[in-house]
Amino acid sequence: MAANDRPDRSDRGADERLRATLAAIAPGTQMRDALERILRGNTGALIVLGYDKTVESICSGGFNLDVELSAPLMRELAKMDGAIILDEKATRIIKANVHLQPDPSIPTNESGTRHRSAERTARQTGFPVISVSQSMRIIALYVDGRRHVLDEPSAILSRANQALATLERYKLRLDEVSGTLSALEIEDLVTVRDAAVVAQRLEMVRRIADEIQGYVVELGTDGRLLSLQLDELLAGVEPERDLIVRDYLPAAAGKRGRSVDDVLRDLDALTPEELLDLGTVARVIGCGGTENLDNPVSPRGYRLLAKIPRLPCAVIERLVEHFGTLQKLLAASVDDLQAVEGVGESRARSVREGLSRLAESSILERYV
């Protein structure tokens, strides 16, 4: 695949800045109330979210205010037809009735005067710029060369609910394949395919959840219930991504060894088409390609040890380092477990009983 087809890290940064700006103007904020008032009053507006020497250099006229932002005041200032300059947090009004003179050589795809000025100002200064169109009755946000039109909360909520239904189906399938993998790990019957399927499903769940999180940000106070539902569905998913890689990533070989973070970044960088290919997923997690999918592989035991209540991460690391594989852990007696640093008799019994319970429940879930 061509390098320019892959997600760029600069795009990731742009997404984060757009999301942060959307949070500052989401429903429930003074800024969003101000924008709604301007729109309802059939008035246009040009608002810059930030002020520095670059912004100052393209400002002409207007007057200084430096007062706390309020929706009624913003509505009145918008009637003057000049641009309004706010601080970066969108909590204070710095200047009003300003004539912006951005570099006319900066390319823009907009046709309206206000929108052209907004896009050029955003590109030249690096600050987000909001344009409220009087004729089209839309609110457009310009951030890092992107244009984002604010939708009605009802439309966003409709899309979010569809995405949430998809996430529920994805999570159900993830639970199924994860349970199957646990049973296969206990029986020492895992193949590369089994591990790759779980890694694939975890990444698919993470991606749809990230999309929903964007809707939560854009909905502001209207997205509280959606946020609670998302948190409930995602409980334990992020740690599971880390654990599946720790279990199956081959041991580092000198300087060429890849870290868990490297693998997670590579999974994140896969295109949707690549993510559907189990061979590609297997290659990313270090288990070879399509030709190796049916090869047997043994986990280290991170996933199952993490399911034992009140077992610290440091102890899990020492147990895995000492025994090396899950099968050796399962075969270990209480005395064997006590030989590990930081594991006393009480904890050794807890680990032994926990592994036995997990083995029993995993087998029952698979065959009963």
Swiss-Prot record:
- Known EC number: 2.7.7.85
Which residues hold ATP? G82, L100, T113, R114, H115, R116, S117
Q: Which UniProt keywords apply?
A: ATP-binding, DNA damage, DNA repair, DNA-binding, Magnesium, Nucleotide-binding, Nucleotidyltransferase, Transferase
Start and end residues of each DAC domain: 15-153
An example of a Pfam family matching this protein is DisA-linker
User: A GO molecular function for this record?
Assistant: adenylate cyclase activity
Query: What is a biological process (GO) this protein takes part in?
Result: DNA repair
Gene3D superfamilies in the record: 5' to 3' exonuclease, C-terminal subdomain, DNA integrity scanning linker region, DNA integrity scanning protein, DisA, N-terminal domain
Q: How does it assemble?
A: Homooctamer.
Q: Which PANTHER family match?
A: DIADENYLATE CYCLASE (PTHR34185), DNA INTEGRITY SCANNING PROTEIN DISA (PTHR34185:SF3)
Query: Per its database record, what is this protein's job?
Result: Participates in a DNA-damage check-point. DisA forms globular foci that rapidly scan along the chromosomes searching for lesions.
Q: Any idea what this protein is called?
A: DNA integrity scanning protein DisA
